[in-house]
Amino acid sequence: MTNIHNDKILILDFGAQYTQLIARRIRELGVYCEIWAWDHNPAEIAGFGAKGIILSGGPESTTLPGAPAAPQEVFDSGLPIFGICYGMQTLAAQLGGATEAADQREFGHAEVNVINPDALFKGLSDHGGEPKLNVWMSHGDHVSVAPPGFTITATTDRIPVAAMANEEKRWYGVQFHPEVTHTLQGQALLRRFVVDVCGCQTLWTAANIIDDQITRVREQVGDDEVILGLSGGVDSSVVAALLHKAIGEKLTCVFVDTGLLRWQEGDQVMAMFAEHMGVKVVRVNAADRYFAALEGVSDPEAKRKIIGNLFVEIFDEESNKLKNAKWLAQGTIYPDVIESAGSKTGKAHVIKSHHNVGGLPEHMKLGLVEPLRELFKDEVRRLGVELGLPRTMVYRHPFPGPGLGVRILGEVKREYAELLAKADAIFIDELRKADLYDKTSQAFAVFLPVKSVGVVGDARAYEWVIALRAVETIDFMTAHWAHLPYEFLGTVSNRIINELRGVSRVVYDISGKPPATIEWE
């Protein structure tokens, strides 16, 4: 079988907000890549076996002493190098060029003039054949003098070196960000570096990743049994489908129905995995235990801890019944791995174990199976579709680990959870009907534990308030509230109030992030 990890790119991260985006763009081209810190062990960088190295952007300044720099091994490797933003600046500074601080930062759209087309720029244009490109800039410093052996390949009205190249050594630098969509030819530039210059084959596809992981899992677990906590979320669902394909009956999924899930989610999970796919699923109806444990608790952090600890307790009880289970499968994905890494600089991204179940008892002594640990979320979704999971499940909006427990403000009660689950289902149903679901990044209902006066028939009634929240975001770090049509919101409000006894008022949350968070608790 072809090794889909053979042709790979190494990204050295200098702390840029866009570094993961570079990696995702390269993966989209069909090429495997990893993100390591700029100060990673140089011997490991040299021994990684990359076909090319990308130096990312970053917040530092090469004009200051002690600025982060690429290890000498990068230049000694003989590999193609592509410096982006700060990556180009450190390339210039380390190889005998010069950088300087600009009078003012350049942030936003810019027009680049290609003056000496190289392997990356040849034939590219956003202006009907003219050698001009529309790009996205985000920098304070810039390269003022290209290093010896480099040709200036592009300029702008504001900076003398917008791009440079040493074609003989296959070293390239650009001051702008090809990884963001605002740079219209960005993906074409990355393709030219990764595929044309570095010679990478495009083997990183959903079908190949599935085949590769099936082989790896079978080699790892042999004839042992594997246990998986199935939540109904995207990651654990894809792990369940993938492992079922790899080891069949040797997989047991434990689905803990907390009573805090989406409307009828427990039945949907059982229908999809147990009935439709034939996966062995143990369903634990634990709602009574959860509501008892949460009684009288209103602090959000305390609620999260109780919900998390109780899950671990129940999962432990169920795993003890499976005497032959030697492995625990988890839906750890690559951003989890990156975030869990640390170094002397705080910027290292070394692959190491990350427990997304959190706090599993030491005595479980199970080996870890993490078939998604190399993948970004968008890749996990593509795998899900390839594995035959319904698109509506794979592309669902995020749902918090503690479930409705953090969407009910204050104390959690069974009656609140049932009302909220139904209200949320109405909101989502109407979003789908109006073709608005995929246009929002996350949408949900929140239960407010305050009673508001309403009129039911001829009588006054004091009933609960439901808040609706919908946001649009690229990375969930910042978000705008979704400008849903008034008529649509009116339809949702009418349905919730008419169909749910106990709700007299529906409000819409128009707060951005920041200052508000996406979830209310």
Swiss-Prot record:
**What's a Gene Ontology MF term here?**
GMP synthase activity
Lipoprotein is among the record's keywords: no
Where do the catalytic residues lie?
A: 85 (nucleophile), 177, 179
Question: Which EC number applies?
Answer: 6.3.5.2
**Binding partners and assembly:** Homodimer.
HAMAP family, per database record: GMP_synthase (MF_00344)
Protein's name according to its UniProt entry: GMP synthase [glutamine-hydrolyzing]
